[in-house]
């Protein structure tokens, strides 16, 4: 089950710590009560710090990060930083393309996300994680799958983890 982090970009300091503590308790309790794996997605996050703060408070493997590559692309820090700081907690990926300004949900290859870099960072995780293509319908899915297979990204048409 995926939840948006809903962490406003201006949350820092004590406000961020309070938010992280409340959310960590909620997600942990929900995951354990219902036997769920919960993934918290970077949604409005301009950098990984809100999710890092959240995961400093979480001690269960039932709560993970859903890293949305498209959202990370238009954030204020490089994709490498998202993987470096959250990699051990990543349990799910959302894939869509954009031109670096806002969330366009374009088919992969139609924006300017560096998919070779994203694939390399995914491989460095050393484990496979579920992925969702958020690309606006069956045509976008077909275009994205063709793109992934042509380049051998994320284990399609090439080597797998």
Model segments located where?
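Active-site acidic/histidine proton-transfer and metal-coordination neighborhood
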Residues: 1-64, 159
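Histidine-acidic metal/acid-base catalytic patches
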Residues: 29, 48-67, 72-161
């Amino acid at each position: 089950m995926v939840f948006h982090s809903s962490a406003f970009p201006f949350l820092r300091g004590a406000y961020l710590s309070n938010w992280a503590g409340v959310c960590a308790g909620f997600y942990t309790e929900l995951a354990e009560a219902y036997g769920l794996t919960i993934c918290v997605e970077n949604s409005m996050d301009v950098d990984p710090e809100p999710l890092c703060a959240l995961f400093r408070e979480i001690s269960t493997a039932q709560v993970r990060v859903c890293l949305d590559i498209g959202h990370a692309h238009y954030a204020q820090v490089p994709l490498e930083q998202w993987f470096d700081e959250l990699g051990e907690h990543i349990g799910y990926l959302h894939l869509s393309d954009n031109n670096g300004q806002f969330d366009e949900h374009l088919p992969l290859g139609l924006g300017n996300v560096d998919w070779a870099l994203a694939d390399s960072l995914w491989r460095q995780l050393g484990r496979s994680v579920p992925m969702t293509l958020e690309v606006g319908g069956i045509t976008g899915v077909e275009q994205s799958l063709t793109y992934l297979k042509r380049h051998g990204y994320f284990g399609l048409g090439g080597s797998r983890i």
